[in-house]
Each structure stands twice: as C-alpha cells, then as structure tokens.
Amino acid sequence: MEFSVKSGSPEKQRSACIVVGVFEPRRLSPIAEQLDKISDGYISALLRRGELEGKPGQTLLLHHVPNVLSERILLIGCGKERELDERQYKQVIQKTINTLNDTGSMEAVCFLTELHVKGRNNYWKVRQAVETAKETLYSSDQLKTNKSEPRRPLRKMVFNVPTRRELTSGERAIQHGLAIAAGIKAAKDLGNMPPNICNAAYLASQARQLADSYSKNVITRVIGEQQMKELGMHSYLAVGQGSQNESLMSVIEYKGNASEDARPIVLVGKGLTFDSGGISIKPSEGMDEMKYDMCGAAAVYGVMRMVAELQLPINVIGVLAGCENMPGGRAYRPGDVLTTMSGQTVEVLNTDAEGRLVLCDVLTYVERFEPEAVIDVATLTGACVIALGHHITGLMANHNPLAHELIAASEQSGDRAWRLPLGDEYQEQLESNFADMANIGGRPGGAITAGCFLSRFTRKYNWAHLDIAGTAWRSGKAKGATGRPVALLAQFLLNRAGFNGEE
C-alpha cells in the first residue's frame, strides 16, 4: 500500500474517495463543513434526516456529491470532539481503512489528520495513521493455501496536512511509520510461525538475511552450542539440552555511528521457540501458544530491521537468544545446580522458569560490547499478566533515567509500559540453601522476583527489562502475535537518534 502527503483544499481533490470526520451530535469537522458548503448543504441535510449521528464507528458513504470532483465522500463518526484521544483516533483510522477496503475504494484522500488530538502534532497523526493502516490490513496467511483478498483492495492513501510547510514533516512521518510498521510485521510474522518451522536455526537464518539485505552496516554472527560451552554459558545450554534442535544465539550488529566513542545500545530478546515447560511440564490446554515464547526475539529482530531501514545515526546490537525447552532423557531437572557465565550458581526449582536462565548468560555475554544501555525483552512471567493484564508491558530497571526514557517513548508511541519496583526486599525470595540463588522466588511478586534475578547479572551497565508476557500475543478469535514492543523500542531509538517528532 502506498502513502503520501499533500496540502490542498477538499473541493480540488479528484480522487476515488475523500474521508472526513463527523462529531456527535451531527457536527461536521472543519473540512466536512467546507464540503457541505460547496455542495449547497447536501451533507448537512443528510445528517438532519438522521443518516449519521457521529458516534464512534459509524460510517456513511456518499456517491456523486454535488459540486465535488471526487467520486465518493466517506463520513466517519469520531464521537464527541472533546473526548477524542490517541486511542479513539487510532480506532477512527482503523474503521476508515476497513470501510475503504471493503467498499472497493482503491485510493483515498484522508482529511482525518485535521482532527484535534490533545498534545499531538501532525507528524504524530500521520505516522500513527500509517502504522494503524498497516496493522489493520495485516493477516497471517503465509501458510494458507487459499488467501482471501478483497476484489478491489485499498492501494493508495493520501494524507492532507494544513500547510505546505508541514509537507516535509508529513513525509518524514510516513517514512518512520512505514519502517516501524514493517518492523512490527516482521515481528508478527516470526511470532506466528509454527515451532516446527521457527526454531533457533530459523531465527538465525532470518538474522543472516537481515545482514545480507543491509550489508553496508549490518553484520550477523551466530554462536552455536560448542562456542557457548567454551564461553561458559552453561545456564543457557541447560535449558535447550532436552531438545533435538540446537540452541543458537544470533548477534546482529548495526553500526550507524563510526565514532570510536559511540557505545552501542544492546537489545536482548528471549527466543524460546517452544516452551513445553520441560520436566516441570505445562498443562496441555493452551500449550500451542507457547510458540509465542520467542516474541521477545521477534521484537528485537523487528526493531533491528527498522533501525537498518531508517539508517539511524546510532549503534545498536540485537541478540536473539534462540532455544527450545523440551522434556526428555537429557533435559535439565528440578534440583540441578547450574553455573552461569558470570560464575554465579543457580538452583533450579522449576524448569518452566527457563527464560531467565537463558537471559542471564546473554546479559553477561553482552558486557563485551561496553554498552550505553541494555534492554532485554521477554515473555517472562505469568505473574506480569496477573499484575498488568494484556494492555500494558511491565518495565523494571536499575537506572532511573533509562526507565524514564522508556516510559516517555511508550507514551509517545502508544505502546504503553508501566514501571514495577526492584527493591532489595524482593531479592530475599531468591535465596537458596545450595546455590547463590534459586531460579524462582515463589508466587508473591513473581514478575518482580524474575526481574530481581536478572538484575544480578546487569551490574556493569545501565539495564532495563520489558516483560511482555501479557502483551506479546492475543488469544481467542483474534489469536496472533501483536508485534509489541517494537513501536515502544522504535520510538526510544528514534529519540536517541534525535528524531522525536516534535518539529
């Protein structure tokens, strides 16, 4: 689908469709008022007859409106004007895209960017419209033999900005929005892949393809089990030893700043391509969804794709920690004591708390990069789902400024996160009689004690942890990966690169 921006009055648009908003109760937006005036009150007369109230989700498609060059006008209900917020704006865009796609409008000029969203500028409105449009049109049909597509799908969308001075900002918004949307799509595609296809080797192949596509400044290295053994990554290796699939750690290095002083930001993604729970096996109900336990790695891959596409002037390293947790004669057991790469020992009390055992060695490994900051992304705990539900990602950090940056980026992007504490009192729950620590701390504060566990391996750099167990995928009829938190991390890196969208 093609996107562009222009600045012009509605009566001069010669398009298949013009899209404008209507507020409750039957109040036309400024552009809709212009069209009504041009058409000698044709639109307002329809509203007076009760054709459209302006409630959220309502639509009215008009054909051959008098004195209007475009074939059709699509009126979209936007609710009460004062109540229009970021969430409702995205819902309006989503409804617009679905309606245009379903009614055979192959191109449209969208004036919804005129809507006032408190605290948001035209860059934000255009970018969010692009991201929302791509999200709305996404379908996971790679493995379907019959792919259903509309007969006349939406091909082109033009966003109108109020002045010519804002065209540059609008074009940048489209560029950023498309790159972020492509990163989200890549993360979703990986997340939705079945575990018999998407194993650690598949993740590695995707990482190598990324380097091939952006060979100018992207390098990928894949570290296998023998190298991990030599590095002392015994905790990581233990998790995968029950599987027939080799554990592989893919390291994607993007260099956008050649300065010797430019330290990288490191993103670490948990990549459990299937988590059966191991010997502490999970219930069979819903176990198919454990293919999503690699959504952290999928998100990191999506972000690295966005960074390379936009050629951001910063250095970023993405690590995809690929592994599979299976029961078997060689599987690790409850009661085992593992020696991590850091030298610290861990008593395994539950083999289903495996993500932290993989991440702890990766967090030690990335010390060699002397990072500016490290952010790990993981579907880590069911406790985070209990605490925050499926709407907000859990955030923990050992560095307040980094946490504040991530929270700000989450608010900017709409991919929200909430900070949880990392107090020393929680560390006591990880005590073990037989090792330096246990791999679980009991049910109370389970998301926090998991973060506390990871914090013991991050003392040499600024670090944040994103627990996406509640936000990485949806269940039920809308089942599928969400691509979160690609948008959050993309905004964080755009801010670091100086593109905060506040021009």
From Swiss-Prot:
Q: Where does Mn(2+) 1 bind?
A: D275, D352, E354
Q: Which domain of life does the protein's organism represent? A: Bacteria
User: What molecular function terms (GO) are annotated for this protein?
Assistant: manganese ion binding; metalloaminopeptidase activity
Which reaction does this chain catalyze? Release of an N-terminal amino acid, Xaa-|-Yaa-, in which Xaa is preferably Leu, but may be other amino acids including Pro although not Arg or Lys, and Yaa may be Pro. Amino acid amides and methyl esters are also readily hydrolyzed, but rates on arylamides are exceedingly low; Release of an N-terminal amino acid, preferentially leucine, but not glutamic or aspartic acids
Which cofactors is this protein said to need?
Mn(2+)
Instruction: For this entry, list what GO says about its biological process.
Output: proteolysis
- Work out whether the entry's keyword set contains Ribosomal protein: no
Q: What is its EC number?
A: 3.4.11.1, 3.4.11.10
Catalytic residues, per the record, are K282, R356
Q: Which residues bind Mn(2+) 2?
A: K270, D275, D293, E354
How many and how are cofactors bound here?
A: Binds 2 manganese ions per subunit.
Q: Which CDD domains match?
A: Peptidase_M17
One matching Pfam family: Peptidase_M17
The family database entries (InterPro entries) matched by this protein are listed as:
Leucine_aapep/pepB, Macro_dom-like, Peptidase_M17_C, Peptidase_M17_leu_NH2_pept, Peptidase_M17_N
Q: Where in the cell is it found?
A: Cytoplasm
Q: Which GO terms describe its cellular component?
A: cytoplasm
* Keyword field: Aminopeptidase, Cytoplasm, Hydrolase, Manganese, Metal-binding, Protease
Q: Which family does it belong to?
A: Belongs to the peptidase M17 family.
Instruction: Show the PANTHER family listed in the entry.
Output: CYTOSOL AMINOPEPTIDASE (PTHR11963:SF23), LEUCINE AMINOPEPTIDASE-RELATED (PTHR11963)
The UniProt function text for this chain reads:
Presumably involved in the processing and regular turnover of intracellular proteins. Catalyzes the removal of unsubstituted N-terminal amino acids from various peptides.
Specify the protein name: Probable cytosol aminopeptidase
Q: Which species is listed as the source?
A: Escherichia fergusonii (strain ATCC 35469 / DSM 13698 / CCUG 18766 / IAM 14443 / JCM 21226 / LMG 7866 / NBRC 102419 / NCTC 12128 / CDC 0568-73)
What is this organism's lineage?
A: Bacteria, Pseudomonadati, Pseudomonadota, Gammaproteobacteria, Enterobacterales
Gene responsible for this protein:
pepA
